[in-house]
């Protein structure tokens, strides 16, 4: 079996229609990619030749250490040498990739509609959805009526005839004529929980099996589409807004789930379904104001009264993602 055939076999593990797209790309471009690897070109050089790297003017698109320099003993290529090296590779292999326009949105169009970090499927525009991924109920409480923007998790209402806040409590006690929402929830300090932050907030995770050749199989990618639609994040299993069991996402995740939301719900069932995770991969502290504008407690979104919310702001991943080795990033 050739290397190209072996890679095509891996493509077959992907769910439809991505298996066909992957196999097609490999059949077209696989031989040239493999030849470049055999010629010891680094991933950065290959990405530059293929054309999937973008960089600001005057910057070099690189992630890994530059290749070794032929001019310096035990040294790496300078920026100028690296750019010349890339130009040589383009001259040798560029024709093979001419016309290739790689756009992830062509593969996952729905996933590219979440740039504003709001639910993709939200008919009534209340920031809550009946669909799980794509910033839906995996991230925020599940909408119980996506055709009515006055019905959403976190609303402060007596719910006499309808469960307007989607916590499962509505109706009136026939013996006292008191709404159940008032009877059970009034005076209990019921509230929601929300968090604004980065990839650590969103619980970013690449399933290890995706990167382990010996574990590649159709089962490995059984949750592939959902994982991509959730940006490789697992907010439904996070420490802040976790509300699901890892067994539902096997084999990608295992172990117990515990969260602030689960503890608050355990202490007071009036808090059921009232959570929001606005964690974004690669976010910085400067994004927090923007994120706060899509928190459903914003009165500019709805004038209807809403319950209080316990709000966290967490930029936990900055130490990992920053390019600057400043003192606060050191273990000390």
Report the location of each language-model feature:
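Conserved beta-strand elements of the Class I
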Residues: 192-196, 311
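Short, solvent-exposed beta-strand-terminating loops
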Residues: 196-212
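Extracellular calcium-associated, cysteine-rich motifs in secreted modular proteins
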Residues: 93-187, 192
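Solvent-exposed, polar/charged alpha-helical surfaces in well-ordered, non-transmembrane soluble domains
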Residues: 5, 9, 31, 44, ...
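Conserved SGNH/GDSL esterase-like catalytic core that processes O-acyl groups on lipids
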Residues: 216-331
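Soluble non-cytosolic domains of exported or imported proteins
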Residues: 5, 20-24, 36-41, 156, ...
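Extracellular/luminal segments of secreted precursors and ectodomains of membrane proteins
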Residues: 1-116
